[in-house]
Amino acid sequence: MAIILGIDPGSRVTGYGVIRQVGRQLSYLGSGCIRTKVDDLPSRLKLIYAGVTEIITQFQPDYFAIEQVFMAKNADSALKLGQARGVAIVAAVNQELPVFEYAARQVKQTVVGMGSAEKSQVQHMVRTLLKLPANPQADAADALAIAITHCHVSQNAMQMSESRLNLTRGRLR
């Protein structure tokens, strides 16, 4: 069993999603958004750090998965996003959580089956995979999708390791 915290970083709205993985089964534990309604960036970063720390304390995750920064057309926006990611990662590292990063395209490919999927498609698939009664908010759905991606990637890596181990023992299943 593992608990995974997924984070969709943003300087104004940071989505979070928490799921539990038992074997191949995924279950929803919680999700939401950290909203920073102050204007100055240092205060927003402080709120993101405090919010992520509180979520970690509440859910006690085993793994922390976060979206990688993509190349934005606006350099200022990309820098702010990078800073928001940075404080979220520091919050995880301060709690001694292993940090995993996933590209947005990889997340969409894993959850929807198409790397260019729309936000509404991600929301729908997250709802379906986690058997939720309604679509989660867009930022929370993205965070849940990041957590789901971590489960799939880590499960595939484990299966590959087992296959390699069996090959070194002279057996292939």
From Swiss-Prot:
Q: Its domain of life?
A: Bacteria
Q: Pfam families annotated for this entry?
A: RuvC
Of the GO CC terms on this record, one is: cytoplasm
An example molecular function term from Gene Ontology annotations: magnesium ion binding
Quickly give the catalysed reaction: Endonucleolytic cleavage at a junction such as a reciprocal single-stranded crossover between two homologous DNA duplexes (Holliday junction)
GO annotation, biological process: DNA recombination; DNA repair
Top enzyme class: hydrolase
Name the protein family.
Answer: Belongs to the RuvC family.
**Species of provenance:** Shigella flexneri
Q: What is the protein's name according to its record? A: Crossover junction endodeoxyribonuclease RuvC
Residues forming the catalytic site: D8, E67, D139
- Indicate which residues the UniProt annotation says bind Mg(2+) 2: E67
NCBIfam families associated with the record = PRK00039.2-1, ruvC
Q: What InterPro entries does the record tag this protein with?
A: RNaseH-like_sf (IPR012337), RNaseH_sf (IPR036397), X-over_junc_endoDNase_Mg_BS (IPR020563), X-over_junc_endoDNase_RuvC (IPR002176)
Q: How does it assemble?
A: Homodimer which binds Holliday junction (HJ) DNA. The HJ becomes 2-fold symmetrical on binding to RuvC with unstacked arms; it has a different conformation from HJ DNA in complex with RuvA. In the full resolvosome a probable DNA-RuvA(4)-RuvB(12)-RuvC(2) complex forms which resolves the HJ.
Co-factor binding details: Binds 2 Mg(2+) ion per subunit.
Task: Look up keyword ATP-binding and say if it applies.
Answer: no
**What does the entry list as the binding residues for Mg(2+) 1?**
D8, D139
Tell me the cofactors it needs. Answer: Mg(2+)
- Where is the protein found, in the record's own terms? Cytoplasm
Catalytic activity, EC:
3.1.21.10
The entry's keywords: Cytoplasm, DNA damage, DNA recombination, DNA repair, DNA-binding, Endonuclease, Hydrolase, Magnesium, Metal-binding, Nuclease
Q: Which PANTHER family match?
A: CROSSOVER JUNCTION ENDODEOXYRIBONUCLEASE RUVC
